[in-house]
């Protein structure tokens, strides 16, 4: 059985090819690309050498094939993936603005992507999981998926695994003022939280990300990994905080970079690396993820990450430093 599992939406993504072209007007699009934050996470972790499994639902259509083929090619276990004949695979349309922001239009609530439930998880699949990664987008898609995530989190925690949470706030799916209530059952059993600054303050009701990290640590979270985009990341524990600068890359498509960061950090921590080394590695993976068009296309293999880090003059420390 896989060591790292995630539950959630599987989508294809179709995106604008030009900046500042809103989705309510005709303009060129490109795609489909396999996507969905939990699926991106699994693909990235598998490419880094981890044993991963994905639980989700696709339609029996070409878009569903696009997703499952990519996951299988990357080595992700898809025993928990269900195909529906009566529903189409979910779709996310994405537009980019020149200020770096994105807007989404999802076909998910009435699509296969949202139809995930506890019963489709194979018996025993979660018993020996080391990390269960939950995304806020999965908690926002449907009641059945939300309840499956809650139940899985309790199960993994009770069996000695670590539950990790990326709030992954999407206002198109969940109003920001509901994020705390929806995420709280996961926070009750989570060990690691991986938010952006905006997500961290929304999640905790604090004025600053730093205060938000302190709040989570005081309430039982072991590690808060604050993703700061082009500025890198800051990792908070009760004992220390470590800030790590980002690697410089030529960004093409930022979608999925945070999911790839999550995957790299969890893979590294699972291998026993130090906090600073894990954060350095995760920054490199997150940066490389932005250098190709398509949310999974830039997810690098481990050898490529190590070569990139060395070429940038910030190599991964030797095993004696981990």
Regions found by a protein language model. Give the residues of each.
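Conserved beta-alpha-beta core of the PfkB/ribokinase-like small-molecule kinase fold
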Residues: 131-214, 231-233
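Short, conserved phosphate/pyrophosphate- and ester-handling motifs at nucleotide-, phospho-/glycolipid
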Residues: 45, 196, 258
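Glycine-rich phosphate/adenosyl-contacting loop at the front of the ribokinase-like
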Residues: 1-77, 252, 316, 322
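Conserved N-terminal subdomain of the carbohydrate kinase-like
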Residues: 51-136, 306-322
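General beta-strand structural signal in soluble alpha/beta enzymes
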Residues: 6-7, 80, 164-165, 194-195, ...
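Hydrophobic anchor at the start of a short beta-strand
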Residues: 51-52, 78, 163, 224, ...
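Conserved phosphate-binding/catalytic region of the ribokinase-like
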Residues: 1-5, 154-155, 205-322
